[in-house]
Amino acid sequence: MPEYPYHKSLRLQNFTVFKDTQFEFSPGVNAIIGENGSGKTHLLKAMYAYNRPPSRDVPDIDAALRQLFQTERVSDIVRSDTKPGSLLEVTGNYGDQDWTYAAHRLPKASNGAGFGDGSGDGSGSGSGAGFGDGAGDGSGANRDAHVVKSGEVKMTQPVFIPSMDMMGHTKGFREAYNSVVLDFDLTCYDILNLFNLKSRVTANGSVPDASHSRLANLLGGEIVADDSSGRFFLKTATGRTDMPMVAEGLRKIASLVRLQSNNWLVPGSTLYWDEPEVNLNPILMQVLIESVLSLSRHGVQVFLTTHSYVVLKELDLQADDDDRIRFFSLQGNQKNGTEVSSTDDFTTLIPNSILNEYSSLYDRDLTRSTGRSRTGERIR
């Protein structure tokens, strides 16, 4: 199999909970664990913000970051204990090319000046990439930092599957998102666009994936789009069911099936998946992880976050010798920021709060049944 460009490394400085944290990634599957608040989703969004191509509604990385983190102020993304003038910087390497974006925490504006590229009119619109959102009023009230993007690196369109199901919430969502303020982040909007866009042709071809058929078979029918209503349906031999009436776990399966059918997950692309286990019965996890591994074997780089032992163990059990899987553990540290450890061997991942908790359950069950600890010590 040819080697496709992939995300090789990442460094987060003063980015939300990260003070100065570095990652070295696998070209295959990158599984990320950590307790709540350790920054797993923030890590994915930091990469996606650069990876995501600009669009009419989200023209630059400044707008992308604010919509990904649902904030009007970029300074909210800067680590909270930094001082004015401190630098938020995200750097990475993709296909042996370096890229970066950065922002300063600025003092509160006192003259109403917006941020631009030197050609702005104080409106906050600016014309340079990475400045403003075109919605400033000259007050500078929400422009206490600005983001500058450099090292333009061409990347394949990424896919971000949020933990929140969106397959059942398609009716009118995109229109509403563009016309009123909705409290949904940009990943929810983006994935609906990919659900609705037709298949495209890519120079790298598509992913031949037998597990895709197995996932489709789990649904028991075909995913059908109704353009007039803006809704998806599951069409079976007995009729069709509105997606909101389909079980959420099956809608998650349907999301992956739809993305593959639309040819968005192709060799050389990147899949970011935030907690794939949400609303999914463990009985479905074997086929799901089989599909994830199949994608990685055909050149799709995968980043997934999880709180599930089943996800981790399925990756461990199903991996072939040639599979490239790396496990990351994030550990929150209020003073030094979130720290990371990584390994290619699931059994040696430390710290591993998921495995520790399952081990604790076993110990408690053993004590309840026998009155002794795992070492044979009498507890009662």
Which functions belong to the PLM regions below?
Residues 1-49, 379:
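Pre-Walker A-like glycine/lysine-rich segment at the N-terminus of P-loop NTPase domains
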Residues 1-11, 50-269, 333-380:
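Phosphate-coordinating catalytic segments in nucleotide- and nucleic-acid-processing enzymes
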Residues 21-27, 263-266, 294:
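Phosphate-binding P-loop
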